[in-house]
Design a protein with these regions (language model features):
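Membrane-interfacial terminal anchoring regions of lipid-handling membrane enzymes
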Residues: 1-689
């Protein structure tokens, strides 16, 4: 009935195969049980005068997919009845078994329409409806691939049982089909299909089910169902067609709404990926952080990571899209649910052991203030536990700083920072966020920080980690070394993120208006403030990775205007309303860690202070500053650092230090104005906590 939709092309592994398919001794072995695939083969044979597959001739068979009675059971492979008949026939040694694959649709890079791409072949087993749509949209782009024949003489001349011959032939065919499919559509990266069985059959999950069921078969089956349900809830389901659509959509997004997504440091990641398992740990400032990293890895031909996402994002429609892009879902709290905990951990461990790259946000959720949040220990602890089981010890954490000149969620961040209760994620909240897609959003930056080698870190901070092994069946939180090293690693990740900050135009502008709102400000005054901020960051930056915008202060002011952060604009002055200033707090906080030490100095010196008194006061408060702002400077180097800052502030005339070591602000009005800006940065940040 639908044959008119199918216009297949014949492809051959070798020229000899083209000749062999005309022989009446041919037996076709199709890779699937699909009637559409069989129709494509029949039509190809008729068009090219090949031996035609017919039931009465018994000259074809179709391999069947593995089936299980219940999802949590081990799948059972079924061999075709026709293959059993061939194995029982002594004349089969003269037959020519030619494996046949049918592919629907072009490769992603050659596809001419996104709908056709969705319904092209992939590793996922399709329903009848999906297969029908595949034929409707890609029937005229079908190809029938004829493999080299099996060595039937070697197989069927052996004096073995027919059951053994069936099993051997079945395995040879499936291996051939899998290799060819991988070459045609890429490797099977759908961990949902390949990992669930391994998770459910892991010793820790089976042991937990056994303990929970107390010897009751009924309870055991119920626990198995629960475990399967949890695994389905957790696992990702990567899809090449969806990833291709992601690529097209995101390419448009970054280059139309933003002035592109600039990635820094990707070259070293290409080198690291050859020898290491990679764990990506980005800062989390926007919903689109999920997409930014995956997009850049995809365009740079690096393995797509498996992304840890909160279960709150597992929404209808959206959850499916995120799964197809590599997200797997994690509940906010495991609570007393030991079975869920075991299933989740085994899933993470299997990904880790099989060499997948993993991405998670150490902060757990998006920052609403713009400052990095305290890292959550859960995933970090699980990764360390998994690491003990690995034979391969090359694992690198990759801290990543993601910085935007404008985030999509600015208004919701403002409401929540003012005390409004955080709203539960739903489709309406997501769509209200992306409504700002129509606006100009400036630049976005993604910079890789200094990698952290996990083995080296553990060797330094927990020397006995290889000897003090973790028994997964016990309460691992009681391991003191694990309890101590987990927050240390989390803080190191956050510190390396801060060391890779890309300073944006909006963050400099926001810092420059820290003590100004609801009044006009001269643009020249504002421009001078921004120049001072740039100079201070450049002079005292504690990492060479920290980047500043390569545009003038006047251009920064104009860009912030273009981003619609302020409305009142005249040739020589502008005015920031209280609401506009509040909206920009987020961006000021993005770079506060680069200015907080100078802000402290300027605040303390607003009244004359002896240098040694300032240093002593600073050393007392510095541990708290270091903790809150994830600053790299060690406690032993703190005094040296503050002395350098004092000298640098003196050089740019913000401070005076007289012969009696008395520190005070400059007498110059412009410099005194800039000093007030720094002092207000301190007042609005650290002292408010």
């Amino acid at each position: 009935m639908i044959n008119f939709l199918i216009s297949p092309e014949a492809e051959f592994e070798t020229e000899d195969v083209k000749r062999l398919v005309q022989s009446q001794k041919v037996i076709y072995a199709l890779s699937t049980g699909s009637s559409f695939d069989l129709n494509a083969l029949i039509k190809t044979a008729k068009q090219n005068n090949f031996s035609q597959p017919k039931k009465n001739k018994k000259n074809f068979f179709q391999l069947k997919g593995a089936k299980r009675l219940f999802p949590w059971q081990k799948p059972r492979r079924r061999s075709p009845r026709e293959l059993h008949q061939i194995a029982s026939d002594s004349k089969s040694v003269d037959k020519i078994i030619i494996p046949v694959d049918v592919f629907w649709g072009k490769a992603p890079e050659r596809q001419d329409h996104w709908v056709k791409l969705i319904f092209r072949d992939s590793w996922e087993a399709g329903s009848f409806l999906r297969n029908l749509l595949k034929v409707i949209f890609n029937g005229r782009q079908a190809s029938v691939f004829f493999h080299k024949p099996l060595e039937t003489e070697d197989i069927f001349s052996q004096k073995r049982s027919s059951a053994h011959l069936v099993l051997k032939t079945d395995r040879l065919l499936r291996a051939r089909f899998r290799k060819n499919r991988q070459a045609k559509i890429g490797p099977d990266i759908s961990n949902k299909r390949t990992l669930i069985h391994a998770i459910l059959n892991s010793s820790s999950v089976k042991q937990e089910i056994k303990l929970s069921s107390n010897g009751s078969k009924k309870l055991e089956n119920n626990e198995k169902k629960k475990a399967y349900k949890y695994a389905l809830e957790i696992c990702s389901d990567i899809s090449y067609p969806v990833i291709y659509l992601y690529d097209k959509a995101l390419n448009w997004f970054w280059n139309s709404r933003y002035d592109g997504l600039e990635i820094l440091g990707i070259e070293k990641i290409n080198d690291l990926a050859v020898e290491n398992s990679l764990i990506y740990t980005p800062s989390h400032r926007s919903h689109i952080d999920y997409l930014a990293l995956s997009y850049e890895l995809y365009t740079n031909n690096l393995m797509l990571p498996q992304i840890v996402a909160g279960k709150n994002l597992n929404l209808p429609f959206l959850g499916r899209i995120l799964r197809n892009g590599g997200a797997f879902f994690m509940r906010r709290s495991f609570g007393p649910n030991r079975l869920y905990s075991k299933v989740f951990f085994e899933h993470l461990r299997k990904l880790f052991q099989r060499g997948y790259s993993i991405e998670f946000f150490p902060e757990g959720g998006r920052t609403r203030t713009g400052r990095l949040l305290t890292p959550r220990p859960g995933i970090i602890s699980m990764i360390i536990k998994s690491f003990q089981d690995m034979d391969e010890r090359n694992v690198k954490f990759l801290p990543i700083s993601i910085n935007y000149e404008k985030v999509l969620e600015g208004k919701s961040h403002l409401k929540e920072s003012r005390g409004q209760k955080k709203k539960k994620e739903n489709l309406s909240s997501i769509f209200s966020t992306i409504s700002d897609f129509r606006s100009y959003l400036g630049n976005a930056y993604l910079q890789f920080g200094e990698p952290i080698d996990l083995k080296s870190f553990l060797d330094k901070h927990a020397p006995n980690w290889q000897k003090d092994l973790i028994d997964l069946s016990e309460d691992t939180d009681k391991k003191s070394w694990l309890f101590e090293v987990t927050p240390l690693l989390g803080n190191k990740i956050m510190t390396n993120i801060n060391k890779a900050t890309v300073v944006t135009s909006s963050s400099l502008f926001a810092s420059s208006i820290s003590d100004i709102s609801d009044k006009e400000i001269d643009k020249k005054r504002l421009s001078f403030r921004i120049e001072v901020l740039k100079k201070v960051i450049e002079t005292d930056k504690y990492s060479e990775l920290i980047k500043l915008p390569n545009i003038t202060s006047d251009e920064i002011i104009q860009k912030v205007k273009k981003l619609k952060f302020y409305k009142y604009d005249k040739p020589k002055v502008l005015k920031i309303s209280k609401n506009e200033k509040s909206l920009m707090e987020f961006y000021k906080n993005n770079i506060l860690h680069l200015l907080i030490l100078q802000a402290y100095v300027m605040y303390k010196s607003r009244k004359k202070i002896i240098k040694n008194d300032l240093i002593n006061d600073f050393l007392e408060i510095f541990p708290q500053i270091k903790k809150d702002f994830f600053i790299e400077i060690s406690l032993s180097n703190a005094e040296k650092k503050i002395c350098n800052i004092l000298e640098n502030l003196k050089k740019i005339n913000l401070l005076k230090i007289d012969s009696n070591s008395e520190i005070s602000w400059s007498d110059n009005e412009k410099e005194k104005d800039a000093a007030g800006m720094f002092a207000s940065l301190w007042l609005e940040s650290f002292s408010a906590n």
